[in-house]
From Swiss-Prot:
Residues 237-316 form a coiled coil. This is Protein FAM76B. It comes from Danio rerio (Zebrafish). Residues 148-159 have a biased composition (Low complexity). Residues 203-213 have a biased composition (Basic and acidic residues).
Length: 328
């Protein structure tokens, strides 16, 4: 019996079966727990966390050392504007695709029209970067759930075939046909389309799920399908709540930015008022000093004139008395 091939984990270099390694990063279960994929606090891009205290990616860490703490971008409100008022992603997109437009999901002025190139990936919608990532996550999760349901459905089909292999071929074909009819009745194309419309981006699937084409026992397929439908509904609800939280955070950031701007203007007005008030006080003090000096000068002149008048009056009296003595 041939042994299955083993593949090395990219982190610890230990060998595991291919099914136990993660897609893309090729990490084992222990490394996925020790180094999870998280979002950067600043640029919101996903990166592999080296330590629990590391919350920003390497690129943002270098930018923080070089430029300091970033500011919210004036377009997407992501705290990643290290240089100027726009983040690097919006700056590059604006140079390549022109000014931003309104996102059809979050209604923010931060979506760049990539023409047919980007709209094909999001079902023809004009979405910003964050809403595009959320849209792709919903699609990926739904595809994974449908793949898991299809594999479990095929396993149950093989078991039912082994149990009923002693029955007549016509009877077995009749049971599989009835089971296939039950599955198709449980999940009609209209219900499947309505389930997708509940997602954030209202995506409509172009292909029917695999469980419509594979026969199995009717009871087990209906139970598994109801569980999958409930799980999909819960995931869509969680995704909607997450998007609402993100939009509320953006609104809070905008309000905080508005409040900070108003506080800055109020501080400038107060400083200007204090400066003008101090200037007026200085002018008043100078005017008072000048007035006092002028009054003192006038009073000194008056005193001098009074002295001169008194001296002149005394001289006239002396002259009169002398002339009276000289007369016979």
């Amino acid at each position: 019996m041939a042994t299955s091939a083993l593949y090395a984990c990219t982190k610890c270099n230990q060998r595991f079966p291919f099914e136990e390694l993660s897609q893309g990063q090729q990490l084992c279960k222990e490394c996925r727990i020790a180094h999870p994929i998280v979002k950067c606090t600043y640029c919101r891009s996903e990166f592999q966390q080296e330590s629990k205290t590391n919350t920003i990616c390497k690129k943002c860490a270098q930018n923080v050392k070089q430029f300091g703490t970033p500011k919210p971008c004036q377009y997407c409100n992501i705290i990643a504007a290290f240089i100027g008022t726009k983040c690097q992603r919006c700056t590059n997109s604006e140079k390549k695709y022109g000014p931003p437009q309104t996102c059809e999901q979050c209604k923010q002025q931060c979506a760049f029209d990539r023409k047919d190139e980007g709209r094909r990936k999001v079902d023809g919608k004009l979405l910003c970067w964050l809403c595009t990532l959320s849209y792709r996550r919903v699609l990926q999760k739904t595809k994974e759930q449908r793949k898991g349901l299809g594999s479990s459905h095929s396993n149950s089909s093989s078991l039912s075939e082994k149990e009923h292999q002693r029955h007549h071929h016509h009877h077995q074909h009749h049971r599989h046909g009835s089971s296939h009819h039950k599955i198709s009745g449980n999940l009609s194309p209209e219900q499947d389309q309505g389930l997708w419309k509940q997602s954030i981006q209202k995506e409509t699937p172009k292909k029917k799920p695999k469980l419509e084409t594979k026969p199995s026992n009717g009871d087990s397929s209906s139970i598994t399908q109801s569980m999958d439908s409930g799980g999909t509904d819960n995931f869509i609800l969680i995704s909607q709540l997450k998007e609402e939280v993100m939009s509320l955070k953006r609104m809070l950031q905008q309000r905080d930015q508005t409040i900070l701007e108003k506080d800055r203007k109020l501080t400038e007005l107060k400083a200007d008022f204090q400066y003008q008030e101090s200037n007026m006080r200085v002018k008043m003090n100078n005017m008072e000093k000048a007035h006092k000096e002028a009054m003192e000068q006038q009073q000194a002149k008056n005193r001098e004139l009074l002295k001169q008048v008194a001296a002149l009056s005394k001289g006239k009296k002396f002259d009169r008395s002398g002339s009276s003595l000289l007369l016979p």
